[in-house]
Curated annotation (Swiss-Prot):
Family stated for the protein in its record: Belongs to the universal ribosomal protein uS13 family.
Keyword Ribonucleoprotein: yes
Entries under HAMAP family matching the protein: Ribosomal_uS13
Chain intervals for the UniProt region annotation (Disordered): 94-120
Protein name (database record): Small ribosomal subunit protein uS13
GO MF annotation list: rRNA binding; structural constituent of ribosome; tRNA binding
Organism the protein comes from: Aromatoleum aromaticum (strain DSM 19018 / LMG 30748 / EbN1)
Length: 120
């Protein structure tokens, strides 16, 4: 298995798909990386030469991925919570942030239902 940005990349997948194993790289960014590195998107990772792999590593290094991206995201959320703004309060309470209704639905964000005694 090849290692790019500290992640084991699956050998049996096409280069474009295999790059999406890295946190912060989706399909469109993977396509741009392959094009910039002059790597054919449809070639399997195991068939790439070492120079191709090096070019891919250099292109991926230009982006914020993996641990740095996770850290940046958590720091942004923590900043909102410390500010005490509306979005920060919603994060703190575990409720939806973007104006969705909460009287019904919002189960994913709120978690499983909590039983309330005498609610009948």
């Amino acid at each position: 298995m090849a290692r790019i940005a500290g992640v084991n990349i699956p050998n049996h997948k096409h280069a474009e798909i295999a790059l999406t194993a890295i946190y912060g790289i989706g399909r469109s960014r993977a396509q741009k990386i392959c094009d910039a590195a002059n790597v054919v998107r449809s070639v399997k990772m195991k068939d790439l030469t070492e120079s191709d792999m090096e070019r891919l590593r250099d292109e991926v290094a230009k982006f914020i991925v993996e641990g740095d991206l996770r850290r940046e995201t958590t720091m942004n959320i923590k900043r909102l919570m410390d500010l005490g703004c509306y979005r920060g309060v919603r994060h703190r309470r575990g409720l939806p942030l973007r104006g969705q209704r909460t009287r019904t639905n919002a189960r994913t964000r709120k978690g499983p239902r909590k039983a309330i005694a005498g609610k009948k």
